[in-house]
Protein backbone atom coordinates (compact mmCIF):
# COMPACT_ATOMS: atom_id res chain seq x y z
CA UNK A 1 0.00 0.00 0.00
CA UNK A 2 1.56 3.26 -1.08
CA UNK A 3 1.63 6.11 1.36
CA UNK A 4 3.04 9.40 2.56
CA UNK A 5 6.08 8.00 4.36
CA UNK A 6 9.36 6.95 2.77
CA UNK A 7 11.48 5.28 5.43
CA UNK A 8 11.45 7.63 8.42
CA UNK A 9 11.44 10.79 6.36
CA UNK A 10 8.21 12.74 6.12
CA UNK A 11 7.64 14.21 2.68
CA UNK A 12 6.24 17.73 2.32
CA UNK A 13 2.63 17.37 1.20
CA UNK A 14 2.54 20.38 -1.12
CA UNK A 15 5.70 19.24 -2.87
CA UNK A 16 4.37 15.71 -3.25
CA UNK A 17 1.24 17.08 -4.85
CA UNK A 18 3.23 19.22 -7.26
CA UNK A 19 5.51 16.35 -8.24
CA UNK A 20 2.81 14.35 -10.03
CA UNK A 21 -0.78 14.94 -10.99
CA UNK A 22 -3.70 13.08 -9.46
CA UNK A 23 -4.03 10.56 -12.28
CA UNK A 24 -0.61 9.14 -11.43
CA UNK A 25 -1.44 8.77 -7.73
CA UNK A 26 -4.99 7.46 -7.95
CA UNK A 27 -6.31 5.72 -11.05
CA UNK A 28 -9.87 7.05 -11.13
CA UNK A 29 -10.55 5.07 -14.32
CA UNK A 30 -10.83 2.00 -12.09
CA UNK A 31 -13.80 3.55 -10.31
CA UNK A 32 -17.34 3.61 -11.72
CA UNK A 33 -18.29 7.01 -13.10
CA UNK A 34 -20.49 7.81 -10.09
CA UNK A 35 -17.68 7.19 -7.59
CA UNK A 36 -15.02 8.76 -9.80
CA UNK A 37 -16.88 12.07 -9.72
CA UNK A 38 -17.21 11.84 -5.92
CA UNK A 39 -13.47 11.34 -5.56
CA UNK A 40 -12.50 14.07 -8.02
CA UNK A 41 -14.74 16.59 -6.26
CA UNK A 42 -13.19 15.63 -2.92
CA UNK A 43 -9.66 16.15 -4.28
CA UNK A 44 -10.62 19.51 -5.78
CA UNK A 45 -12.06 20.58 -2.43
CA UNK A 46 -9.03 19.53 -0.34
CA UNK A 47 -6.17 19.26 -2.86
CA UNK A 48 -3.26 18.72 -0.47
CA UNK A 49 -4.75 16.11 1.87
CA UNK A 50 -3.06 13.11 0.26
CA UNK A 51 -3.37 10.79 3.24
CA UNK A 52 -7.11 11.43 3.33
CA UNK A 53 -7.38 10.96 -0.45
CA UNK A 54 -5.70 7.57 -0.10
CA UNK A 55 -8.15 6.35 2.56
CA UNK A 56 -11.18 7.47 0.56
CA UNK A 57 -9.87 6.01 -2.70
CA UNK A 58 -9.27 2.61 -1.12
CA UNK A 59 -12.77 2.52 0.39
CA UNK A 60 -14.43 3.66 -2.85
CA UNK A 61 -12.58 0.91 -4.74
CA UNK A 62 -14.32 -1.67 -2.54
CA UNK A 63 -17.75 -0.09 -3.05
CA UNK A 64 -17.94 -0.62 -6.82
CA UNK A 65 -20.35 -3.63 -6.58
CA UNK A 66 -22.59 -1.63 -4.25
CA UNK A 67 -23.09 1.17 -6.78
CA UNK A 68 -24.72 -1.15 -9.30
CA UNK A 69 -26.86 -2.92 -6.70
CA UNK A 70 -28.02 0.21 -4.86
CA UNK A 71 -28.46 3.10 -7.32
CA UNK A 72 -30.60 4.90 -4.73
CA UNK A 73 -27.40 5.57 -2.74
CA UNK A 74 -26.33 7.90 -5.53
CA UNK A 75 -29.68 9.67 -5.55
CA UNK A 76 -29.30 10.35 -1.81
CA UNK A 77 -25.63 11.44 -2.15
CA UNK A 78 -24.59 8.80 0.40
CA UNK A 79 -21.00 8.65 -0.84
CA UNK A 80 -20.61 12.43 -0.78
CA UNK A 81 -22.04 12.55 2.73
CA UNK A 82 -19.90 9.77 4.15
CA UNK A 83 -16.65 11.32 2.85
CA UNK A 84 -17.33 14.76 4.37
CA UNK A 85 -16.85 15.04 8.16
CA UNK A 86 -19.81 16.19 10.21
CA UNK A 87 -17.49 18.51 12.12
CA UNK A 88 -13.80 19.51 12.06
CA UNK A 89 -12.34 21.30 15.07
CA UNK A 90 -8.86 22.88 15.04
CA UNK A 91 -7.59 24.83 18.02
CA UNK A 92 -4.53 26.45 19.58
CA UNK A 93 -2.82 24.63 22.47
CA UNK A 94 -0.48 26.94 24.44
CA UNK A 95 1.60 25.38 27.22
CA UNK A 96 4.73 26.16 29.23
CA UNK A 97 7.84 24.02 29.58
CA UNK A 98 9.79 23.51 32.80
CA UNK A 99 11.84 26.66 32.10
CA UNK A 100 8.72 28.79 31.78
CA UNK A 101 9.00 29.12 27.99
CA UNK A 102 5.63 29.23 26.23
CA UNK A 103 5.03 26.90 23.26
CA UNK A 104 2.03 26.72 20.95
CA UNK A 105 0.82 23.56 19.21
CA UNK A 106 -2.22 22.82 17.10
CA UNK A 107 -4.99 20.50 18.28
CA UNK A 108 -7.50 18.61 16.13
CA UNK A 109 -10.74 16.70 16.52
CA UNK A 110 -12.49 15.46 13.38
CA UNK A 111 -15.95 14.12 14.20
CA UNK A 112 -16.55 12.19 11.02
CA UNK A 113 -19.80 10.27 11.34
CA UNK A 114 -22.32 9.66 14.13
CA UNK A 115 -24.95 7.69 12.19
CA UNK A 116 -24.52 4.64 14.45
CA UNK A 117 -23.77 6.35 17.76
CA UNK A 118 -21.46 8.80 19.56
CA UNK A 119 -18.19 9.60 17.82
CA UNK A 120 -15.41 7.22 18.89
CA UNK A 121 -11.71 7.32 18.05
CA UNK A 122 -8.29 7.95 19.50
CA UNK A 123 -6.08 10.96 20.15
CA UNK A 124 -2.58 11.03 18.66
CA UNK A 125 0.27 13.24 19.92
CA UNK A 126 3.03 13.25 17.31
CA UNK A 127 4.88 15.99 15.38
CA UNK A 128 3.62 14.60 12.04
CA UNK A 129 -0.04 15.13 12.94
CA UNK A 130 -1.99 17.35 10.55
CA UNK A 131 -5.58 17.63 9.34
CA UNK A 132 -5.06 15.19 6.47
CA UNK A 133 -3.74 12.42 8.72
CA UNK A 134 -6.51 12.96 11.27
CA UNK A 135 -9.15 12.79 8.51
CA UNK A 136 -7.45 9.65 7.09
CA UNK A 137 -7.67 7.95 10.49
CA UNK A 138 -11.14 9.27 11.33
CA UNK A 139 -12.58 8.09 8.02
CA UNK A 140 -11.25 4.57 8.54
CA UNK A 141 -12.50 4.63 12.14
CA UNK A 142 -16.10 4.82 10.85
CA UNK A 143 -15.80 1.40 9.26
CA UNK A 144 -13.68 -0.20 11.99
CA UNK A 145 -16.25 0.79 14.61
CA UNK A 146 -19.21 -0.29 12.49
CA UNK A 147 -17.77 -3.80 12.21
CA UNK A 148 -17.92 -4.25 15.99
CA UNK A 149 -21.73 -4.18 15.90
CA UNK A 150 -21.69 -1.62 18.72
CA UNK A 151 -23.42 1.79 18.51
CA UNK A 152 -20.32 3.85 17.78
CA UNK A 153 -19.57 6.50 15.19
CA UNK A 154 -16.14 7.43 13.87
CA UNK A 155 -13.74 10.22 14.86
CA UNK A 156 -10.05 10.96 15.41
CA UNK A 157 -8.05 13.72 17.05
CA UNK A 158 -4.69 14.76 18.36
CA UNK A 159 -2.00 17.40 18.21
CA UNK A 160 1.35 18.04 16.54
CA UNK A 161 2.98 17.78 19.96
CA UNK A 162 5.98 15.53 20.52
CA UNK A 163 5.90 13.96 24.00
CA UNK A 164 9.36 12.42 23.57
CA UNK A 165 11.92 14.05 25.84
CA UNK A 166 9.27 15.95 27.81
CA UNK A 167 8.99 15.73 31.58
CA UNK A 168 5.85 14.41 33.27
CA UNK A 169 5.02 17.96 34.36
CA UNK A 170 5.34 19.30 30.79
CA UNK A 171 3.11 16.55 29.41
CA UNK A 172 0.58 17.20 32.17
CA UNK A 173 0.46 20.92 31.36
CA UNK A 174 0.07 20.20 27.65
CA UNK A 175 -2.76 17.71 28.29
CA UNK A 176 -4.52 20.19 30.56
CA UNK A 177 -4.33 22.93 27.93
CA UNK A 178 -5.46 20.52 25.19
CA UNK A 179 -8.47 19.35 27.21
CA UNK A 180 -9.43 22.91 28.16
CA UNK A 181 -10.58 23.36 24.56
CA UNK A 182 -11.47 19.76 23.67
CA UNK A 183 -13.94 19.44 26.56
CA UNK A 184 -16.31 21.77 24.73
CA UNK A 185 -16.77 19.18 21.99
CA UNK A 186 -16.87 15.78 23.75
CA UNK A 187 -19.00 13.88 26.25
CA UNK A 188 -20.20 10.33 27.04
CA UNK A 189 -23.14 10.65 24.63
CA UNK A 190 -21.40 12.91 22.10
CA UNK A 191 -17.78 11.94 21.46
CA UNK A 192 -15.60 9.49 23.41
CA UNK A 193 -11.86 9.82 22.65
CA UNK A 194 -9.22 7.22 23.54
CA UNK A 195 -5.45 6.88 23.24
CA UNK A 196 -3.27 6.39 20.18
CA UNK A 197 0.39 7.09 19.37
CA UNK A 198 1.86 9.29 22.11
CA UNK A 199 -1.26 9.01 24.26
CA UNK A 200 -1.20 6.21 26.82
CA UNK A 201 -2.63 5.70 30.28
CA UNK A 202 -0.62 8.58 31.74
CA UNK A 203 -1.89 11.08 29.18
CA UNK A 204 -5.48 9.80 29.40
CA UNK A 205 -5.26 10.31 33.17
CA UNK A 206 -4.13 13.91 32.79
CA UNK A 207 -6.84 14.56 30.19
CA UNK A 208 -9.57 13.00 32.32
CA UNK A 209 -8.45 14.94 35.41
CA UNK A 210 -8.74 18.23 33.54
CA UNK A 211 -12.11 17.28 32.04
CA UNK A 212 -13.45 16.39 35.49
CA UNK A 213 -12.11 19.64 36.96
CA UNK A 214 -13.67 21.82 34.27
CA UNK A 215 -17.03 20.02 34.14
CA UNK A 216 -17.31 19.42 37.90
CA UNK A 217 -18.59 15.95 37.07
CA UNK A 218 -17.14 12.43 37.18
CA UNK A 219 -18.24 11.31 33.70
CA UNK A 220 -16.28 8.07 33.51
CA UNK A 221 -17.59 7.37 30.00
CA UNK A 222 -16.03 10.44 28.39
CA UNK A 223 -12.66 8.77 27.71
CA UNK A 224 -11.61 5.16 27.28
CA UNK A 225 -8.16 3.88 28.17
CA UNK A 226 -8.31 5.14 31.77
CA UNK A 227 -6.68 3.34 34.67
CA UNK A 228 -8.71 0.78 36.60
CA UNK A 229 -8.78 3.07 39.64
CA UNK A 230 -10.90 5.68 37.86
CA UNK A 231 -13.31 3.74 35.71
CA UNK A 232 -11.09 1.92 33.22
CA UNK A 233 -11.75 -1.52 31.76
CA UNK A 234 -9.87 -4.76 32.40
CA UNK A 235 -7.63 -5.82 29.48
CA UNK A 236 -8.07 -2.43 27.74
CA UNK A 237 -4.29 -2.01 27.59
CA UNK A 238 -3.74 -5.37 25.94
CA UNK A 239 -6.81 -5.37 23.71
CA UNK A 240 -5.45 -3.90 20.46
CA UNK A 241 -2.23 -5.91 20.36
CA UNK A 242 -3.94 -9.12 21.40
CA UNK A 243 -6.73 -8.49 18.90
CA UNK A 244 -4.25 -8.08 16.05
CA UNK A 245 -2.66 -11.43 16.84
CA UNK A 246 -6.02 -13.19 17.22
CA UNK A 247 -7.05 -11.93 13.78
CA UNK A 248 -3.70 -12.98 12.30
CA UNK A 249 -4.02 -16.41 13.92
CA UNK A 250 -7.40 -16.90 12.23
CA UNK A 251 -5.89 -15.86 8.89
CA UNK A 252 -3.08 -18.37 9.36
CA UNK A 253 -5.57 -21.08 10.34
CA UNK A 254 -7.49 -20.45 7.12
CA UNK A 255 -4.26 -21.33 5.30
CA UNK A 256 -3.73 -24.48 7.33
CA UNK A 257 -1.04 -23.16 9.66
CA UNK A 258 -0.58 -21.17 12.89
CA UNK A 259 1.83 -18.89 14.77
CA UNK A 260 3.57 -21.91 16.29
CA UNK A 261 7.20 -21.93 15.14
CA UNK A 262 6.84 -18.77 13.06
CA UNK A 263 9.48 -16.04 12.94
CA UNK A 264 7.72 -12.69 13.49
CA UNK A 265 8.70 -9.03 13.09
CA UNK A 266 6.69 -6.38 14.97
CA UNK A 267 7.17 -2.71 14.17
CA UNK A 268 6.86 -0.24 17.02
CA UNK A 269 7.42 -0.78 20.73
CA UNK A 270 4.45 1.01 22.22
CA UNK A 271 1.27 -0.37 23.68
CA UNK A 272 0.08 -2.23 20.55
CA UNK A 273 3.49 -3.66 19.67
CA UNK A 274 4.31 -4.84 23.20
CA UNK A 275 1.11 -6.83 23.61
CA UNK A 276 1.15 -8.15 20.05
CA UNK A 277 4.65 -9.44 20.81
CA UNK A 278 3.48 -10.97 24.08
CA UNK A 279 0.50 -12.78 22.54
CA UNK A 280 2.39 -13.97 19.43
CA UNK A 281 5.03 -15.58 21.65
CA UNK A 282 2.34 -17.13 23.85
CA UNK A 283 1.03 -18.79 20.67
CA UNK A 284 4.45 -20.27 19.91
CA UNK A 285 6.02 -17.66 17.62
CA UNK A 286 9.43 -16.08 18.07
CA UNK A 287 9.34 -12.29 17.71
CA UNK A 288 12.82 -11.34 16.54
CA UNK A 289 12.54 -7.57 15.97
CA UNK A 290 10.82 -4.46 17.34
CA UNK A 291 11.42 -0.78 16.64
CA UNK A 292 10.87 2.84 17.59
CA UNK A 293 11.52 6.15 15.83
CA UNK A 294 15.26 5.89 16.54
CA UNK A 295 15.77 2.51 14.84
CA UNK A 296 15.13 -1.18 15.43
CA UNK A 297 16.41 -4.10 17.47
CA UNK A 298 16.96 -7.65 16.25
CA UNK A 299 17.01 -10.31 18.97
CA UNK A 300 17.45 -13.79 17.53
CA UNK A 301 16.73 -15.34 20.94
CA UNK A 302 13.27 -13.77 20.87
CA UNK A 303 12.18 -10.45 22.33
CA UNK A 304 12.16 -10.43 26.14
CA UNK A 305 8.73 -8.87 26.71
CA UNK A 306 9.31 -8.05 30.37
CA UNK A 307 12.54 -6.21 29.55
CA UNK A 308 10.77 -4.40 26.70
CA UNK A 309 7.99 -3.31 29.08
CA UNK A 310 10.55 -2.11 31.60
CA UNK A 311 12.42 -0.05 28.98
CA UNK A 312 9.42 1.44 27.17
CA UNK A 313 6.60 1.59 29.74
CA UNK A 314 8.34 2.12 33.06
CA UNK A 315 11.58 3.94 32.14
CA UNK A 316 10.26 5.42 28.86
CA UNK A 317 13.61 4.76 27.23
CA UNK A 318 14.70 4.17 23.63
CA UNK A 319 14.75 0.80 21.93
CA UNK A 320 18.57 0.96 21.95
CA UNK A 321 18.38 0.67 25.77
CA UNK A 322 16.87 -2.79 25.28
CA UNK A 323 19.85 -3.87 23.16
CA UNK A 324 22.28 -2.48 25.74
CA UNK A 325 20.81 -4.83 28.36
CA UNK A 326 20.40 -7.93 26.20
CA UNK A 327 23.46 -9.75 24.88
CA UNK A 328 21.53 -11.50 22.10
CA UNK A 329 20.15 -8.22 20.72
CA UNK A 330 21.67 -5.71 18.31
CA UNK A 331 20.42 -2.21 17.58
CA UNK A 332 20.44 -0.54 14.17
CA UNK A 333 19.70 3.12 13.48
CA UNK A 334 19.96 2.58 9.71
CA UNK A 335 17.75 0.70 7.29
CA UNK A 336 14.26 -0.62 7.91
CA UNK A 337 12.82 -3.23 10.24
CA UNK A 338 11.05 -4.69 7.18
CA UNK A 339 14.44 -5.83 5.86
CA UNK A 340 14.59 -8.39 8.69
CA UNK A 341 13.59 -11.85 7.31
CA UNK A 342 10.37 -13.19 8.83
CA UNK A 343 7.33 -15.40 8.26
CA UNK A 344 4.81 -12.92 9.67
CA UNK A 345 5.02 -9.10 9.75
CA UNK A 346 2.85 -7.20 12.23
CA UNK A 347 2.85 -3.41 11.62
CA UNK A 348 2.08 -1.75 14.97
CA UNK A 349 3.70 1.69 14.73
CA UNK A 350 1.82 4.02 12.38
CA UNK A 351 -0.19 4.17 9.15
CA UNK A 352 1.29 3.31 5.74
CA UNK A 353 4.29 1.48 7.17
CA UNK A 354 4.71 -1.37 4.74
CA UNK A 355 6.90 -0.58 1.71
Model-identified regions with their sequence ranges:
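Acidic, Ala/Val/Gly-enriched low-complexity intrinsically disordered segments
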Residues: 6-13, 19-21
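Transmembrane alpha-helical segments of multi-pass membrane transport proteins and ion-pumping complexes
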Residues: 181, 185, 274, 348-349, ...
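Long hydrophobic segments that form regular secondary structure
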Residues: 334-355
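Glycine-rich phosphate/diphosphate-binding loop of Rossmann-like nucleotide-binding domains
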Residues: 227, 232-338
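Structural motif
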Residues: 108-109, 158, 190-191, 220, ...
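N-terminal ligand-binding/catalytic initiation module
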Residues: 16-234
